[in-house]
């Protein structure tokens, strides 16, 4: 088994918005395939017409593309085991079901949930124990009688009367005792296949060697192993894949991260201005680490080092502050022209316009690259370049534009009006001479009113560079307006 070419799969259901737990699962599968030189198969589990949507399907594709996780087989790529959407594979499942029924691996079960509970109660058992395998040995006459009543059976797999064990690549040896897992349904009463059937059937037919998935699905593993063995006996499967159950992702209060938690929504992170490198780096840390002494690494470095055997089995908590810090590191690591291009695209997407030309925008971007945590932070720092977006923050004004700042603004205006070459060095020299030497002010007292007047805020990109980019006329006009208000 372990000598086979690694084939892993990512098989989300197209429901709702992609969440970080789903993406973490995709990342670990993708990284393991790339690390081993194997195949990353992307499959869509869209057998629930009531919940599935084309919008969610498109969102999953969008998420994978944005993150740069390419797939070797799947929708829009194709592959030897097409189709890769379960809704298009119904005939395949019906054929497998027929073969399982013919071989006696599954049987028709007519019991209703109410009848199962009643039998448990009559025997003094907990009525919520689940199915009791009652229909296993129905006679032909009993089945006919149920059918004559108009009942339509589900099909259930005969679970073996033995322990079901596997060596989980994350959790180690795992065993479910004989009799602890009842016979389970693989079809609905209308004959439609259930997830419990189609997932292992697709894995078998697509020759998936390793199943990496969330630990919440671990209780279904003994059922799937039993089904794989049945599929092997009828010639559908060649082997039982290896399993690795990834740790849960926790949210605030150490509760499992829910789809209702804002930080679980992948696209909210993108909208804030996370870059793929930062988000993927952080998601990789939810159960794995490249080394004890550093948490920041590239995707290539992750691929080179990733082994599913190194994944930690303990739950991992989503820490937004740490995610932000790692994203900030990745932003700082970008080449300046790369950061500029991404920031421009982000601004265009969100309708932000600095009104700067390309050259000036690149200079402005360079001023904030080391000052932002997410791309969205940059708009608050750069919007003052747009006269329509510029406004003086009242808290900053209350602190810096007091009556006593009039002398500072007067001196600044007088010095700057005499500047001939409107460049950063000239602006800096004029203001320092007038304010630090002339008025004998400390830098914070000297430049605080200037900064608020020019940028509208107490926190801004470097002041002198900002004034050069803003230009002489607009800088002086804002200083005069600020002087008038004090």
From Swiss-Prot:
The protein's Enzyme Commission number: 6.1.1.17
Transmembrane segments: none
Cell compartment(s), UniProt: Cytoplasm
This protein's record includes keyword Disulfide bond: no
Molecular function via GO: ATP binding; glutamate-tRNA ligase activity; tRNA binding; zinc ion binding
Top-level enzyme category: ligase
Major location category of this protein: cytoplasm
Reactions performed catalytically: tRNA(Glu) + L-glutamate + ATP = L-glutamyl-tRNA(Glu) + AMP + diphosphate
Signal peptide (from-to): none
UniProt entry keywords in alphabetical sequence: Aminoacyl-tRNA synthetase, ATP-binding, Cytoplasm, Ligase, Nucleotide-binding, Protein biosynthesis
The UniProt record lists the keyword Phosphoprotein: no
GO terms under cellular component: cytosol
Motif 'KMSKS' region location, chain numbering: 256-260
Gene3D superfamilies xrefs: 1.10.10.350, Glutamate-tRNA synthetase, class I, anticodon-binding domain 1 (1.10.8.70), Glutamyl-trna Synthetase, Domain 2 (1.10.1160.10), Glutamyl-tRNA Synthetase, Domain 3 (3.90.800.10), HUPs (3.40.50.620)
Span(s) of short sequence motif 'HIGH' region: 12-22
GO biological process, one term: glutamyl-tRNA aminoacylation
Residues engaged in binding ATP: 259
Domain of life: Bacteria
Family from the record: Belongs to the class-I aminoacyl-tRNA synthetase family. Glutamate--tRNA ligase type 1 subfamily.
Protein role: Catalyzes the attachment of glutamate to tRNA(Glu) in a two-step reaction: glutamate is first activated by ATP to form Glu-AMP and then transferred to the acceptor end of tRNA(Glu).
Record text on subunit structure and interactions: Monomer.
HAMAP family recorded: Glu_tRNA_synth_type1
Official protein name in the record: Glutamate--tRNA ligase
Taxonomy of the source species: Bacteria, Bacillati, Actinomycetota, Actinomycetes, Mycobacteriales
